[in-house]
Curated annotation (Swiss-Prot):
The keyword Cell membrane applies. Belongs to the ubiquitin-activating E1 family. ULA1 subfamily. One of its GO terms (cellular component) is plasma membrane. The lineage of its organism: Eukaryota, Metazoa, Chordata, Craniata, Vertebrata. This is NEDD8-activating enzyme E1 regulatory subunit. The gene is NAE1. Regulatory subunit of the dimeric UBA3-NAE1 E1 enzyme. E1 activates NEDD8 by first adenylating its C-terminal glycine residue with ATP, thereafter linking this residue to the side chain of the catalytic cysteine, yielding a NEDD8-UBA3 thioester and free AMP. E1 finally transfers NEDD8 to the catalytic cysteine of UBE2M. Necessary for cell cycle progression through the S-M checkpoint. Overexpression of NAE1 causes apoptosis through deregulation of NEDD8 conjugation.
Length: 510
């Protein structure tokens, strides 16, 4: 019987448990997130992380609370003005090593570069967030982020009808569609129907699978001919056959290893296994060895089938064929894991059965995201010019907003303030900001043109942090933090820019 506390938790987090499961929720509840600066953006991020149940937070804000802060931050009151909030920042850089993720909001460029360097060397993920007028900006800095459960949209079913394993082939052969009672005929799973007619198709086409549109239409006609006829010669209403006809494309997908998985297999981290190798790469190496041996060039069977029209008995039997094969494949991968762990002097239990099963059932969807460091992005010789210049084919591309943010940071470095922070400064700052933009583009060798309209607009922003933009960015940032912590779904790589002017967004690898 389930414990009352567990039931309460399931009721409280029902929706999100459907997204990332118990193990994802456990990761969130054991996470420790550091938020630097409780600005409007920071507060929105915090709110969106508190609600899903993040375990603990540390907020670092060394600034005095001002009237502007009280207006931006709904956690502060007017009575807070003039009082200094608790300073949780320890000057020792190792202070940051305790956190699962660090989120930095509204930090100046010089501070960001120092912080990013510390976290990069400690391999602590950093998410930079910034609201500047009607512009939202996020940058993820993480050396390596492996994802087992990427949850791809429109994932293809793993049915193996083009390469049936022996147990599946034997199961298909147990059906004789030509000598069935009407009830059994109309309750045969569509996977079996397609497999039976595929065998007939092979015999007529020298084993060639239907590939072209015409071939697939001919194959559908072949299935259609198998629908039972009544005494008047009219086709019976057999929904399972109609379901088979609709699922021809799904069923005839080629069983192959995705290129993204091949890239993982060919990665140095997968080839060279040491005692320091993370569990993901040990599992990936074991998977690679399984493919080369027991899998005969194929990944482990996923072990799931879609819902379909069939009687319970037939459906469960078919489901069990796939499930048993999935268990058998997972056990084979597990043997490779055990041998690898032994070879590097690691305990067999250092990789759990749960991790193993999770990897095998998601073996076609593994992802590894590697972001560039902030130092590389800001380096004169390492800046990604190609990404910027190619994006500037459209003069209103969101990359322009990135260039403007770099320009206002240069303005801040030169003048000790952001452009247009006071109304009387807006006009005089236009020329100064344009000069900063020109200097930045020349220094980095970026031969692109930015419209004067953007310079004027950024001066009018006055470094304001409108709550509408902060709220949007807070939700988006919290989503990325959750992805990082749960290691589920795929984070963007590596820069995200939102334009409140056009209500569009884009990602760039900078």
């Amino acid at each position: 019987m389930a414990q009352p506390g567990k039931l309460l938790k399931e009721q409280k987090y029902d929706r999100q448990l459907r997204l990332w499961g118990d193990h994802g929720q456990e990761a969130l509840e054991s996470a420790h997130v550091c938020l630097i600066n409780a600005t409007a953006t920071g507060t929105e991020i915090l709110k969106n992380l508190v609600l899903p149940g993040i375990g603990s937070f540390t907020i670092i804000d060394g600034n005095q609370v001002s009237g502007e802060d009280a207006g931006n931050n709904f956690f502060l009151q007017r009575s807070s003005i003039g009082k200094s909030p608790e300073n949780l920042l320890d000057n020792d850089p190792s202070f940051f090593c305790r956190f699962t993720v660090v989120v930095a909001t509204q930090l100046p460029e010089s501070t960001l570069l120092r912080l990013a360097d510390v976290l990069w060397n400690s391999q602590i993920p950093l998410l930079i967030c910034r609201t500047y007028g009607l512009v939202g900006y996020m940058r993820i800095i993480i050396k390596e982020h492996p994802v087992i459960e990427s949850h791809p949209d429109n994932a293809l079913e793993d049915l193996r009808l083009d390469k049936p394993f022996p147990e599946l082939r034997e199961h298909f052969q147990s059906y004789d569609l030509d000598h069935m009672e009407k009830k059994d005929h109309s309750h045969t799973p569509w996977i079996v129907i397609i497999a039976k007619y595929l065998a007939q198709w092979y015999s007529e086409t020298n084993g060639r699978i239907p590939k072209t549109y015409k071939e697939k239409e001919d194959f559908r006609d072949l299935i259609r001919q198998g629908i039972l006829k009544n005494e008047n010669g009219a086709p019976e209403d057999e929904e399972n056959f109609e379901e088979a006809i609709k699922n021809v494309n799904t069923a005839l997908n080629t069983t192959q290893i995705p290129s993204s998985i091949e890239d993982i297999f060919n990665d140095d981290r997968c080839i060279n296994i040491t005692k320091q190798t993370p569990s993901f790469w040990i599992l990936a190496r074991a998977l690679k060895e399984f493919v080369a041996k027991e899998g005969q060039g194929n990944l482990p069977v996923r072990g799931t089938i879609p819902d379909m029209i069939a009687d319970s008995g037939k459906y469960i039997k078919l489901q069990n064929v796939y499930r048993e094969k999935a268990k058998k494949d997972a056990a084979a991968v597990g043997n490779h894991v055990a041998k690898l762990l032994q070879s590097i002097g690691q305990a067999p239990e250092s990789i759990s059965e749960k991790e193993l099963k999770l990897l095998c059932s998601n073996s076609a969807f593994l992802r590894v995201v590697r972001c560039r460091s902030l130092a590389e992005e800001y380096g004169l010789d390492t800046i990604n010019k190609d990404e910027i210049i190619s994006s500037m084919d459209n003069p209103d591309n969101e990359i322009v907003l990135y260039l403007m943010l770099r320009a206002v940071d240069r303005f801040h470095k030169q003048h000790g303030r952001y452009p247009g922070v006071s109304n009387y400064q807006v006009e005089e700052d236009i020329g100064k900001l344009k000069s900063c933009l020109t200097g930045f583009l020349q220094e980095y060798g970026l031969s692109v043109m930015v419209k004067d309209d953007y310079v004027h607009e950024f001066c009018r922003y006055g470094a304001a942090e409108p709550h509408t933009i902060a709220a949007f960015l807070g939700g988006a940032a919290a989503q990325e933090v959750i992805k990082i912590i749960t290691k589920q779904f795929v984070i963007f790589n590596n820069t995200y820019i939102y334009s409140g002017m056009s209500q569009t967004s884009a990602t760039f690898q900078l």
